Every structure is written in C-alpha cells, then in structure tokens.
Amino acid sequence: MLLRFIAENIFSFKDAVEFNTFPSSKSQTHPHHKVDCSHATVLRLASLYGANGAGKSNLLAAIDLLHKAVLEGSLDKIGLYDNISFRFDQSLKNQPSGLAIEFFHAEKIFYYHIEFKKGEVLLEELYISKKTRDVEIFRRDGNKIHINEDYLPKGMSNEKYVDVLDRFIRPDMLLLSFFGHYYPNEIKVITDAFMWFVDSLRVVLPDTVSGYVPHLLDKHAPFRELVNDTMPELKTGISSLEVNKVPVSEETVQGNQAMIDAIREARKSPDTPQVVQRMTEAGVEIANIVFEDGQVWQKTLVSVREDARGHLYKAPISIESDGTQRLIEYMPLFFSVT
C-alpha cells in the first residue's frame, strides 16, 4: 500500500513535493476510512486535486518513472538520458533529481529513495520504518555500497559482500532491482521491497498523446490541414502543430537500446512508424521512428505558439497540459468522421 511519495527537482517540481495517504490529525470521524499499516494509520483512498497545470500529471509521471526504473533495473533501459531536472531554474540544471516512496508490504513499512542525474544513480537507499526509528537495509552513495550486516548471509562481512557487488553494479543500475531480479533468495527483506513494485504498484496514466500522429501529420496533407485549422479554435494557445523530423542511425543513438531496437524494426518495415517513448528535459516525449526514402527518421510533434510580442516560437508537445494533449490525441478520430 502506498503511504507517501516525494519528488524533488524533476519535471515541474523545484522543491520537494509530497503526496501522502495519512489522515488529518483533526479528523476523528469515519474511522472505517482508515486502515492500520504496522505503526501507521492511513487512508484507504486518497485523491489528488489541483488547477490545470498545477502538476497532477507530473506527479503521476514521476511515480511511473520510478516504477519503470525499478522494474527494468536500469535508468538506461527506460531511456533516461536527458536532464529532467526542474527546467525553469538554471541553477538546478546540474543538480540531481530525487524520488522517494514509502509503502507497506509484507507487514513492514519500507522507505526507498534514489537521487540521479541523467542516466546515473548518485544515491540509493532502502529503510524499514519503525515506530521510533528507521532501520537501514542498504545505502549506496556514488560507488560506495553499505549493507546492514544483520541482513547479510551468515559468515559474510559487509566488506566482502560489497566487493563482489562492485564488480556487477553499473552506475545506471538500481541495487534494489539487482537483488530482486538476480538474487531474490539472497536477502529476503530486499526482495520483499522489490516485489511490491512488481506485484502491487500500478500506475494508470492517460493514453499517451502522439501514437502515430507525428507520422500522420507529416505524410497526410488533409489531416495536417484539418489539425491546423482546428487547433486555433480550441483556445489552447497553440497556433499550429508541426513535425520535427531528423535523421537517426544506430551510431547517433549509441547506448539507447530502445531507439536501436526501433531503428532495426523500422528498417524491416519501411513506411511503418515505430513508437518510442523518451524522457527529455521537457517531460515524456513520443517519437515515431520511420524508414522512408532510404533513410531512418525520427519524427516528434512540436506546438507553435505566439508570444506577447506576436513572435512565433516552437515547443515540444510534452510541455502541454494533459487536456491539450488529449485534444491532439483525438484528432485522428475527428478526421475519420469529417
């Protein structure tokens, strides 16, 4: 059960923002709305409210990012190459982003926290939260790993154990996932925490914008005309939509396995777009990878807006609100019935 989630210096969050399921100390009614989780009392259900652009979707995206990172076991495998720190303060650009989650599972309250910059884990720690103190299970600070010897296999010292781990753990890898995937029987308490991400945590997001829209907008003139006639009338601030189209190859995306796989699939099926999700500084971006005219292209959507002086500027579609992205997503349906 999710108890608390904290995000800092990521997407639209500059300072640490917390979402939790703890009841207000002032509320003494509706006891059936609460449930005991070890020493903590939490709500069975919590909702998130806020104005358009307040960060609701980004909070869910941050939870989804952590979930995917743990399941995959690597920041590289989820395409986390670009800086996704808070984008409106340049002083934070080179500072790490942080995600922390507290949850109840296997009769224990766990606290898991990571800090990272681009594709490198800088800090990772797992604790068991008790009523009066927190018990460290492991802590990884840079390339220094410490595991609580109370949880190590009998006869194994922390120094010897960590020496072995250092040979396997790359900077992009998560220690929690390494144990969960490859050594689930080694340290049970770590496996318990990992299995909560596998079996219990589910993140349901709105269907991603784009899909095949970048390719359709690029190649189908009637659809492009309809979209750009309609968007200004919807009062979203967008004057038109364009496609950013750049050539890509396996050499230009070295290290990004998702892109490499998409390029190879695109070559097998010319003119059929492959959909790739990427993490960028602006947020989650959907790209179409298409092999056409003897070249592999990456196509992404950009919105064209007008500033206060009447100058046009372009921005990635990923910075638009969920509502605006949903409108764009419905454009193929709208086109099919007109």
What are these regions (language model features)?
Residues 45-48, 264-335:
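Conserved ABC ATPase signature
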